């Protein structure tokens, strides 16, 4: 039997307690109703939906401040969303996600009510790179829309997908945003050099962004690939425009991530860009 001493009631659904000298946050419907500091709760008489042990004092303070500015209905919907993500996403760490996602949804909801929408320029890149997280995020947004009687734009699906993906991938939110930005700029360079519009539903696009994502990961781990000299010469001579485009994109990646770029990397990216060129010639 787990016993918890109430140290603070944040609202009807959230209380801060101590358990064996460890401060925890208990979440459950009505769990905080009429609960006062010093009261003892036990898991045999109350329904606990989630127990969060936030590691740092900064996390604890931030979460408490968020809960205090959100009404109970919004907070319950966020709790339901966290439970859904925890039960659906693979390898998700709830205690890491609880603060960031609570923060994001509270302020996204406030902005929406004030008709302030932040555009997300990386929706397509996020959908392609993190398709599982994007699918889960779409279901979360559908649930939020229904429960709060609002209509979050598709931009928010992308934002929430990044929160989920950053929790399950070996990348931070900042790193994923950088990768999305590099991919978007890379596509801009391709469209300019090849005088075309890239079909973001195409297999060529999907292969390109996957290649760039894994290329950046490899380079940051200092894992390099090597192509034979005659193969390098052949590709440079056969596809000079695509080679030049690949060089521009990899130079941008080199500056953005402070990594070393080899001739072989340029060659393999050239081949991916050539697939776009082939599609243009076929149309």
From Swiss-Prot:
InterPro entries: BglG_antiterminators, CAT_RNA-bd_dom, CAT_RNA-bd_dom_sf, PRD, PRD_sf, Transcrpt_antitermin_CS
Molecular function as annotated in GO: RNA binding
Domain PRD residues, every copy: 69-173, 174-283
Disulphide linkage map: none
Gene3D superfamilies recorded: 1.20.58.1950, 1.20.890.100, CAT RNA-binding domain, PRD domain
Keywords: Repeat
UniProt KW Repeat keyword: yes
Superkingdom of the source species: Bacteria
UniProt keyword annotation of Acetylation present: no
SUPFAM superfamilies registered for this protein in UniProt: PTS-regulatory domain, PRD, SacY-like RNA-binding domain
SMART domains cross-referenced by the UniProt entry: CAT_RBD (SM01061)
Any GO BP annotation: positive regulation of DNA-templated transcription
Family label: Belongs to the transcriptional antiterminator BglG family. GlcT subfamily.
PANTHER family linked to this entry: CRYPTIC BETA-GLUCOSIDE BGL OPERON ANTITERMINATOR, PROTEIN GLCT
Name of the protein in its database record: Protein GlcT
């Amino acid at each position: 039997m787990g016993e918890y001493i109430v140290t603070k009631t944040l609202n009807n659904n959230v209380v801060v307690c101590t358990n064996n000298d460890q401060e925890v946050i208990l979440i459950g419907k009505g769990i905080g109703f009429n609960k006062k500091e010093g009261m003892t709760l036990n898991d045999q008489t109350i329904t606990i939906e989630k127990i969060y042990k936030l590691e740092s004092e900064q996390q604890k303070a931030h979460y408490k401040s968020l809960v205090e500015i959100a009404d109970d209905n919004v907070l319950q919907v966020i709790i339901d969303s966290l439970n859904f993500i925890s039960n659906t996403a693979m390898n998700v760490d709830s205690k890491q996600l609880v603060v960031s996602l609570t923060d994001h949804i509270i302020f996204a909801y406030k902005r929406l009510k004030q008709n302030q929408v932040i555009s997300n320029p990386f929706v397509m890149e996020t959908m392609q790179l993190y398709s599982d997280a994007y699918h889960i995020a779409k279901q979360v947004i559908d649930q939020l829309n229904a429960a709060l009687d609002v209509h979050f734009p598709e931009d928010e699906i992308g934002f929430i997908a990044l929160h989920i993906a950053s929790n399950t991938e070996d990348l931070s939110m900042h790193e994923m945003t950088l990768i999305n930005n590099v991919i978007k700029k890379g596509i801009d360079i391709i469209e300019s050099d090849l005088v075309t519009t890239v079909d973001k539903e195409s297999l060529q696009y999907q292969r390109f962004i996957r290649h760039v994502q894994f290329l950046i990961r490899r380079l940051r781990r200092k894992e390099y690939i090597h192509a034979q000299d005659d193969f390098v010469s052949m590709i440079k001579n056969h596809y000079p425009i695509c080679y030049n485009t690949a060089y521009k994109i990899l130079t941008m990646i080199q500056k953005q991530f402070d990594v070393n770029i080899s001739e072989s990397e340029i060659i393999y990216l050239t081949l991916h860009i050539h697939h776009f060129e082939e599609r243009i010639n076929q149309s």
